[in-house]
């Protein structure tokens, strides 16, 4: 049996960490001292570290050049073990990972964490900035003086209130990756369907099937409007893959609809873009806690 490592869980500083699928801006990551573990992206049998060795623009340039769809591979237990060993002597660690239905990576993190007394792994049951919203909550809870264990428990209570919905411009990537139930029924249709994908209970599902991209954006706004009186004020994100002008449009429309002071535009990294394709865009937020 492996001996657990790590020190007292009460007196240490809290380190917040995540994988590269969280899609939070580098400026935010640096400001709050977040540690990021990169996924591997494979294109035409060449491996790249997400966020470090390949950008989203470069990803699709390589797809055009090679005519090969990219593949992602989970972060290994050994990589997590090395990371936790590096920081667990100085920090209590809260690690927030890509939802377990989308990758085995977070399960590898859980496996590695079992060797330590002071490493807490959170399965976000989400993706992209949906995980990023949880990172932001963890930062705020750390600022309030909560311990790593307390932060972990609070995040687990928040997870069911995270809302992630995005419009897909091309079904090719999502369908080939087999990541969303229901896409096979509409893939290849002559209609210009741009499905709205939601994350429900940790899984991606097709929520609506608008015809045309602009109608897809309107559907996103309509879904937001239904929640507008119950949105947590800490942070909302507009996350997209090479859809800058659409992000500007959505931010303008959202500002007319809700009085939210913290709307952050984020760019989808290579992990999310690999499965969702160019011009995918979403609105992500957390609902208020029912009192």
Show which residues each predicted segment covers.
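Mixed-charge interfacial surface used for oligomerization/domain docking
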Residues: 4, 9-13, 20-35, 40, ...
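Class I S-adenosyl-L-methionine
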Residues: 47-115
């Amino acid at each position: 049996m492996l001996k657990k490592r790590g020190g007292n869980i009460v007196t240490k500083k809290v380190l917040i960490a995540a994988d590269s699928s969280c899609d939070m801006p580098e400026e935010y990551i640096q400001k709050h001292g977040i540690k990021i573990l990169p996924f591997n992206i494979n294109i035409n049998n060449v491996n790249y570290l997400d966020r470090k060795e390949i950008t989203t623009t470069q990803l699709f340039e390589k797809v055009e050049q090679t005519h090969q769809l990219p593949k992602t591979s989970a972060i290994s237990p050994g990589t997590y073990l090395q990371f936790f060993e590096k920081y667990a002597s100085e920090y209590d660690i809260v690690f927030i990972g890509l939802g377990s239905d989308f990758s085995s990576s977070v399960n590898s993190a859980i496996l590695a964490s079992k060797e330590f007394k002071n490493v807490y792994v959170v399965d976000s049951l989400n993706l992209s900035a949906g995980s990023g919203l949880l990172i932001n909550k963890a930062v705020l809870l750390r600022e309030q003086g909560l311990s790593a264990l307390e932060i972990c428990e609070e995040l687990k209570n928040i997870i069911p209130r995270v809302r992630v919905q995005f419009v897909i411009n091309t079904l090719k990537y999502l369908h080939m990756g087999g990541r969303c139930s229901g896409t096979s029924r509409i893939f290849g249709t002559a209609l210009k369907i741009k499905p709205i994908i939601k994350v429900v209970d940790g899984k991606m599902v097709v929520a609506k099937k608008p015809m045309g991209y602009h109608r897809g954006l309107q559907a996103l706004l309509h879904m937001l409007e239904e929640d507008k009186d119950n949105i947590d004020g800490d942070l909302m994100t507009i996350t997209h893959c090479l859809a800058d002008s659409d992000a500007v449009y959505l931010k303008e429309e959202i500002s007319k609809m809700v009085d939210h002071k913290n709307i952050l535009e984020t760019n989808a990294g290579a992990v999310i873009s690999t499965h969702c394709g160019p011009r995918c865009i979403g609105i992500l937020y957390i609902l208020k806690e029912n009192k």
